[in-house]
Amino acid sequence: MLLINRQDRERLGLSQALEACRCMTPQGKRLKAKYRYFGPDERRLLKAELSAVDQLIEYVKHHPLELRNAQDQLAHFRDLRGTVAGLSKSRTLDLTELFEIKQAVRLLHKLLKIPGLLAKADITIHPLPELEALLDPRELGTSGFYLYDEYSSRLAALRQSRAELEKEMEKAQGEERAALLRQRSQLLAGEAEEETAVRAVLCGQLAPFADRLSDNLQAVGQLDFRLAKAQMALRWGASKPDLLEAGEAVILEQFHHPVIEDHLSARGAAYERQTTTLARGTTVLTGANMGGKSVTLKAMTLSVILIHLGYFPPAEYAASPLFGFVSYSSDYFDTTKRGLSTFASEVVKIRDDIRQARQIPGFVVLDEPLRGTNPQEATALVGALGRFYASLPGVLVLATHYEVPAGAGIRHLRLRGIQAGDLEEIMEITKDPPPDEEAVRRIEALMDYSIETVDGSAAVPTAAIRIARWLGLDSGVFEHLEEQE
């Protein structure tokens, strides 16, 4: 399950990332909107889902004409849940609903003519020749629907009588025309009555096939959804993830966050892709401010979540065991509606995660937790959290500025950040800082976002004071800083 509130889902960028998964049918869009999570006991189902998407990727690459044909059909499917439900409950459908069913049957027939696509998608669509015959008794092959004369000899006779009467009306005048109009009204009433009876009989004939039609429409949604996943994977350059055994380490090679990468690219900035391994227990991620910790956490969490949702994650290679839940918590909490402080909200979220983690292995991500309390107690709590999760079967990834001592089950990673020599170089070149935007751009350009493993006792490189001085922070502040030293 996903334990992510709406605000953190937005900050993680999950919904925005999945905008690249472009379903065309109402059925496919519903499947996407469900956020179907595959847990440890659904490994076989997830493996089948990922394999189908993988096969579709190859199909999409090599069969562009068939793909375009399939998309042309998918684009015309409508949401027929109410119509099909009414049919199964013996409700008499109106002409519009009958037209929609005929159109769906016709579209299904066309998809059946692309068997290679259905096979690669691992989708079964059952032929419906009985429905085709009932809805198109003249075998015209048209998409429109009409209550054909073949449905009722009485209806055909009434229509014929009306047609003859209308010819007479063309020449009639006065009282004669008025009498003919009265006759025509009677014929029209008879037609309407007979058409209602015909629709009732026709719906009774269609009703036995309602379940099969419903199954086919669900299959169309699955086809659409898997096809959208395959095309998204191609756009991202993503590969099929490997599913590992419980307790094995998560592996992410050259992973990235597509939304953030697109945003940076749009303003001419580069995004550095990263590689890491997240072992069972606690992983502590450190690094200076502006060093990219939050982006790194978002990107790695997004990849793990997407695997559990049946997508290919945005990485050159990814492998993960299946977790019972994935939880992501950023440093922002919408507390106004609950009447809780930021600290209280964080503790409640951490409490709930721990309750889950005691029962099932989870993947828990905390981005600088407990910033809202004093540093001494926060350091103690964060350190205790790290040690607590170290003994659990899941994974905790913790980004923090607080010290977390080394120990069994605790691993320390660091974003390299700005190297001292590089910082000194730009400060020497430009004694006076450039305009603010240019200064920030230069600092960002110096950042090394690669992830390295460090000894738990290694110092975190810092450049905050030098950067603050270079950016023109009032010298009086530094005088007080020197006094403290």
Residue positions per predicted region:
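Conserved amphipathic alpha-helical "coupling/scaffold" segments
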Residues: 1-151
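Alpha-helical initiation/capping and key positions within long helical/coiled-coil segments
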Residues: 45, 72, 100, 208, ...
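A structural signal for well-ordered alpha-helices, especially hydrophobic packing surfaces
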Residues: 50, 54-57, 61, 81-88, ...
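Glycine- and acidic
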Residues: 62-63, 202-207, 283-287
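Conserved C-terminal helix/linker of AAA+ ATPases
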Residues: 97-101, 234-244, 478-485
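Extended, charged alpha-helical coiled-coil/arm scaffolds that mediate oligomerization and mechanical coupling
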Residues: 128-218, 222
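Charged, amphipathic alpha-helical linker segments immediately N-terminal to NTP-binding catalytic cores
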Residues: 215-261
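ATPase nucleotide-binding head domains, primarily ABC-like/P-loop NTPase cores
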Residues: 246-485
